[in-house]
Each structure stands twice: as C-alpha cells, then as structure tokens.
Amino acid sequence: YDREVFTSFADDLGVIHLTADTDKALNFSFGMNRPEHYKVTADGNDLLMQGQLPDGVDTLEMKGLRYASRVRVILPKGGTVTPGDSTVSVQNASEAILLVSMATDYFDKDLDGKITSLLANAGKKDYASLKKAHVAAYRSLFDRVELDLGHSSREDLPMDERLAAFNEDQDDPSLGALYFQFGRYLLISSTRVGLLPPNLQGLWCNTVNTPWNGDYHLNINLQMNHWPAEVANLSELHLPLVEWTKQQVASGERTAKAYYNARGWVTHILGNVWEFTAPGEHPSWGATNT
C-alpha cells in the first residue's frame, strides 16, 4: 500500500492518494471529526462537515465564523462507494483519490457553493495532473533561491540524528542552508496574494483554542514571520501583510482619537483579522504602541 498527501495552492484543496499493488485490495471507511462544534453527514457520496464557532466573547453564543468541508472520493480504476450516516466506505478499489475542500465565511459567504466548486474543478483532473500543478505552484516560488554554504558527511543522516550531532560538533554548514530553506518553505506554505498573512501560531497549530488566540503580535513576531519575504526573493508573499496593515487604518483612527485624542492612526501590541487596534491584555505590555 502507498499513500501520498499534499495540500495544493494550485487547486485550493487537500489531496490524498491511495494505491495498492494488488487489484481491488483497497477496502476502507473514512470520516471527519474535530474536538467541538461540528456535524458530519454523508451527502450523496461526499462527506460533509459543517459548524459554527463561538464568537470569542460569549462562548454560549455560537455567532462566530461558519465553516464547512467536503471530502469526495474518486476511484479511477473502479470499486464501490457506499455512504453511511457519518462515514463513507470504499470496497474493492485499486486506487483512490480523496479530495478535501474547506472554507470559512470570512472570505466566502456561500460556503457550500465554494467547496463544491473546488471539488468539481479538481475532480476533472487525474492524480498526476493534480500533483504536477501543486509541485509547479510551489517550485515557482521555492526554486528562485539557492544557498550553498558547503557540504558535510552528515547530509544523509535522519534529521534527529543530525541535530544531535550538531550539538556536539557544529561543523555542518549545509544544515544552516537547509534551515534557511525551511524558513522559505514555511512562508510559501502559509500565504498567497489575496489571503491573510501568517499569524502567531501558523497553519500548523494543533489546538482548538490557540495560545494568544493565534493573533498577530506586532512587537516582533509578525515581523519575524516575514523576514524571508524580501531577502529570500518571496516579495509577493509580503503583500498580504501590506493589505492587512491597510485594513487597520480606519479602526486605528478611532483608537487614536479615543485613547490619545490624536490625529492619524495607531495600533498596539495585539492585532487580529477583525481590525482590533486598541490596547489589550495586560496593562504592563498591552498598551505598547506600534
């Protein structure tokens, strides 16, 4: 059995590819879940998750973002798809492609229309085409820069062993180059023009209630996320931050007037995607002007 998984900016969805070296050897069921605030149903042969989050003020009032996700299975070499109440089963398949689309109503009010359209467009392509488009979209950014600091004999070591060896002997220059490219990978994977800039916890946060609400800390963290943008030839990935900053102006003007009776605009140490510009959290540091 082989499994490949990637998320694609080219098609704006996740792709799971399952194969077996024996005909009709794939037999499985799949579902979706999260820790809270969700409902999963089978909708035809799709699996549909829907929910609405708390508003962040009153956890009993479910008036926050709405979200939805669909999973559609495609069997290029045949097999059977059987929907259940909250799972979908596949029998006697040799290859399966699971397409996972998702959206919130932050950008798209027609959630189901959005995620259904993504699946319809991606479903017209075979797996090779989906993967090719994904790799091309990534490499169009990643391949712009190479960094050669020299080589060492440790380059073939597993990363945990390589890091342990580095603690004992720092003569591993290509590890620094790899770490440089890792930073570029994180920014490339986090945003595109027209989307939001990467936040404090990033896309890979593993908790529902993220530390510091996954906000934008303006003292240094937001800047650190964008350090690779200009110097590492990823300038367009700086644009989401520029647009986000523009969105703070109207709110920041009200904050400047209310708190300081000042002209212009101001924000403080905490920001978010809803134009929060007032002092926040603790008075010892929450009033830091930015």
In which residue ranges do the predicted regions lie?
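Aromatic-residue-lined binding/catalytic grooves and analogous aromatic/hydrophobic interfacial grooves
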Residues: 1-281
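Active-site neighborhood of glycoside hydrolase catalytic domains
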Residues: 288-290
